[in-house]
């Protein structure tokens, strides 16, 4: 993850990750819904104080997480 500004990550890296998620998916709509659902979960986790304070927005974090899960499935538990 490349840090480029105070707000979080490199926008080019984020765009490439998002494009990769969409390109590798069989259903663009479901991928978009997964990103939105994960972002909503992260937002509530942040609100409840369960996660450390982050400068990365929930949608950005969800794209990064889903991209990492897609690219490196061996990192997933189970």
Curated annotation (Swiss-Prot):
This protein's UniProt keywords: DNA-directed RNA polymerase, Nucleotidyltransferase, Transcription, Transferase
Cross-referenced Pfam families: RNA_pol_Rpb6
GO cellular-component term (any): DNA-directed RNA polymerase complex
Catalytic reaction annotation: RNA(n) + a ribonucleoside 5'-triphosphate = RNA(n+1) + diphosphate
Keyword Transferase: yes
Keyword Transcription: yes
EC number of this enzyme: 2.7.7.6
Superkingdom classification of source: Bacteria
One GO biological process term: DNA-templated transcription
A single MF term (Gene Ontology): DNA binding
NCBIfam families found in the cross-reference section: PRK00392.2-5
Protein family: Belongs to the RNA polymerase subunit omega family.
Oligomeric form and interacting partners: In cyanobacteria the RNAP catalytic core is composed of 2 alpha, 1 beta, 1 beta', 1 gamma and 1 omega subunit. When a sigma factor is associated with the core the holoenzyme is formed, which can initiate transcription.
Protein's job: Promotes RNA polymerase assembly. Latches the N- and C-terminal regions of the beta' subunit thereby facilitating its interaction with the beta and alpha subunits.
This protein's name: DNA-directed RNA polymerase subunit omega
Organism: Prochlorococcus marinus (strain MIT 9312)
């Amino acid at each position: 993850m490349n840090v480029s500004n105070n707000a979080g990550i490199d926008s080019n890296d984020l765009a490439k990750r998002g494009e990769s998620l969409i390109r590798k998916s069989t259903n663009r709509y479901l991928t978009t819904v997964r990103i939105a659902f994960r972002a909503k979960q992260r937002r509530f986790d942040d609100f409840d104080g369960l996660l450390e304070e982050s400068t990365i927005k929930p949608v950005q974090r969800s794209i990064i997480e889903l991209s990492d899960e897609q690219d490196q499935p061996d990192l997933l538990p189970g």
